Curated annotation (Swiss-Prot):
NCBIfam families: PRK11655.1. The keyword Cytoplasm applies. Pfam families: Chor_lyase (PF04345). One of its GO terms (cellular component) is cytosol. Substrate binds at residues 37, 79, 117, 159. GO terms for molecular function: chorismate lyase activity. Its main location: cytoplasm. This is Chorismate pyruvate-lyase. Its EC number is 4.1.3.40. Pathway: Cofactor biosynthesis; ubiquinone biosynthesis. GO terms for biological process: pyruvate biosynthetic process; ubiquinone biosynthetic process. InterPro entries: Chorismate--pyruvate_lyase, Chorismate_lyase_/UTRA_dom_sf. Belongs to the UbiC family.
Amino acid sequence: MQDQAIVAILDGIRWLQEPPVWPDDATRSWLTERGSMTQRLEKHCGKIRVRRYREGFVTACIEAWEAALLPDCGRFWLREVVLYGHDRPWLTARTLVPAAAEAGPAQQVLSLGDVPLGQWLFRHRPPARDVIQFGRVGTLWARRARLRLTEGQPLLLTEAFLPDCPLYISGGDAPQQ
């Protein structure tokens, strides 16, 4: 599957209005992970590879639910990526940062390049997570969260767990070969 099709999965997420009934404890553990998802994935492959699909400033093309969770500034930094483990796509993610964050701690997000967001986010003090919601795309799981950085700056992160992700493997925390 091409990165364009993988990233398009983010647009098809059906967000759940109620907390989900988890199929098992492993799924719940993955979806409610409060630490770095990058670190959790790297336990299964050693090193995550990031492929950027789209990155740059956008205006007015964000979804209504995204706008409701971020300050009304009209301009946002958008980063859409696919994370690969063992050369297989495991997770696709979208990060939105208000343009006003260019002057604060979030300015480093604008220059991450191929560095995983989680590697930067959890390097020092973990961000506060004040909103989290779960969703589905067919049989795939997704989550979105508003994170607050050190000065309270918001960052919106949406993640969809792709079919080859260790989440879906029986015993989802056993390292893969």
